[in-house]
Amino acid sequence: MTRAIVVTATDTDVGKTVFSAGLAGLLDGCYWKPVQAGLADGTDSDTVRRLSGLPDDRILPEAYRLETPASPHHAAAIDNVVIDPALLAPPPCDRRLVIEGAGGLLVPLAGGLLFADIFAGWRFETVVVARTALGTINHSLLTIEALRARDIPILGIAFIGDPQEESERTIAAIGGVRRLGRLPRLDPLDAGTLAAAFAAAFSPEDFAP
């Protein structure tokens, strides 16, 4: 049976791919992005390959690779591709598998099918990645509420950005979720700086099955 952690976020461009790379590296696991929309500027799998330190065979191929950089349902329509949820079964991996969603939890895949519906079917523990910037309390609590409404297990919330103790504490308290830690924005960002920062902010025990 696949032992997986799903990584979702409160919005796009939060830092979910960087977090996924750090987590996959910390766990010495595998990584999988079910649906990649947009290929010309590189893929999230390419980023994780560069930043995680994992061998290529542990960056598992996407179920769908869409040319158009857009929400998956729109990219699929433009590319004349039909996304079949039956093909979104997590691939086998003999290590912990980090699964990265697209954008936020309620991103549509096809018709009325949302990423949240796929996650609900899998029932893997899910990490919410959130900004620390203004507005994150509302976005984070809405995401937590949407996960709970679908009975998706929540492992905890991880923040990315400058420290905002009050916002981070408030989200964890009101949302009733574990506060896993905070990853700072990194400059330079490479495999070495990410591994060091991730190990300082999180431990493998935070993500134990």
Swiss-Prot record:
GO molecular function, one term: ATP binding
Biological process (GO), any one: biotin biosynthetic process
Names of the cofactor(s): Mg(2+)
Active site per database record: 33
GO cellular component, one term: cytosol
Top-rank EC class of the record's enzyme: ligase
InterPro entries: DTB_synth_BioD, P-loop_NTPase
Keywords: ATP-binding, Biotin biosynthesis, Cytoplasm, Ligase, Magnesium, Metal-binding, Nucleotide-binding
Localization annotation: Cytoplasm
Superkingdom: Bacteria
Binding site for ATP: 13-18, 100-103, 184-186
Catalytic activity line of the entry: (7R,8S)-7,8-diammoniononanoate + CO2 + ATP = (4R,5S)-dethiobiotin + ADP + phosphate + 3 H(+)
Gene3D superfamilies: P-loop containing nucleotide triphosphate hydrolases
Amino-acid positions noted as binding Mg(2+) in the UniProt annotation, renumbered to this chain: 17, 100
The keyword Metal-binding belongs to this UniProt entry's keyword annotation: yes
Known partners and oligomeric status: Homodimer.
Family, per entry: Belongs to the dethiobiotin synthetase family.
Descriptive protein name: ATP-dependent dethiobiotin synthetase BioD
